[in-house]
Regions:
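NUDIX/MutT-family hydrolases
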Residues: 153-192
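N-terminal leader/linker segments that precede catalytic domains of diphosphate-processing enzymes
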Residues: 1-90, 95-112, 116-149, 191-231
Length: 231
């Protein structure tokens, strides 16, 4: 799997976004091992988080359950006290600091948020840039974490880290696309467990499936975010 993903990324003409009005950020897509049944209890109130979301239409209750097993990626639940995107699902990541590359930033944020120190030799490649409504261009960096990494999330930023099996990305009900009156572009939804992951994280995960796992080069940067993620 490692070489397949590496080769698929290497053979892809990556879409880079250059927009001086947006800030640059990077996220770490970390591939690891996982065991069936190691899901943890979500510390965020699902009922509160689901308020106003159309979960019933997707026959989901918002709980991240039964997602582990086999090759997996790391997914974080952001702390509820954060000033932006509080309690949302996200990949480890953040702003690219002056003098850093996207790879530098992804490795640093992974270390700061999840307590994992990986080297540049673990980089399998980059996915396409994704421009967000909140003023960022996100560069996803795919990393090979290998076996059983010890996760030590920083509680002021991350309240939970899940190992989500890659099989979740290839479910029969994934991906989902819906329309919203605020935009002509389709909103992408990626079902994981009993929850829905939206762009930008959802777009990154969809390209991880399409390009990384299946060798499919379809773009995802025009897929829309839900309105609650625009700020």
């Amino acid at each position: 799997m490692r070489e397949r993903i590496r080769n698929n990324l290497a053979g892809h003409h990556r879409r880079a976004v250059t927009d001086p009005t947006k800030r640059h950020a990077a996220v770490a897509v970390v591939l690891v091992d996982s065991e069936v049944g190691e899901d943890r209890v979500d510390p965020v109130s699902v009922e509160e988080w689901n308020d106003g979301r159309e979960m019933a239409a997707a026959h989901l209750d918002g709980r991240m359950v039964d997602v582990s097993g086999g090759a997996a990626f790391l997914l974080c639940r952001r702390a509820s006290r954060l000033s932006s995107h509080a309690a949302q699902w996200a990949l480890p990541g953040g702003r690219v600091d002056p003098g850093e590359t996207a790879v530098d930033a992804a490795l640093r944020e992974l270390r700061e948020e999840v307590g994992i120190a990986l080297s540049g030799s673990t980089v399998l490649g980059l996915l396409d840039d994704y421009p967000t409504r909140s003023g960022y261009v996100i560069t996803p960096v795919v990393l090979w974490g290998g076996g059983r990494l010890e996760l030590r999330p920083a509680p002021d930023e991350v309240v939970a880290v899940y190992r989500v099996g890659l099989h979740q990305l290839q479910r029969d009900d994934s991906p989902r696309f819906i329309t919203i009156p605020e935009s002509p572009r389709p909103v992408v939804q990626i079902p994981l467990g009993n929850d829905l992951i939206h762009a930008p994280t959802g777009a990154v995960l969809l390209q991880l499936r399409w390009l990384g796992l299946e060798g499919r080069a379809d773009p995802v940067d025009e897929l829309e975010q839900p309105v609650f993620a625009w700020k």
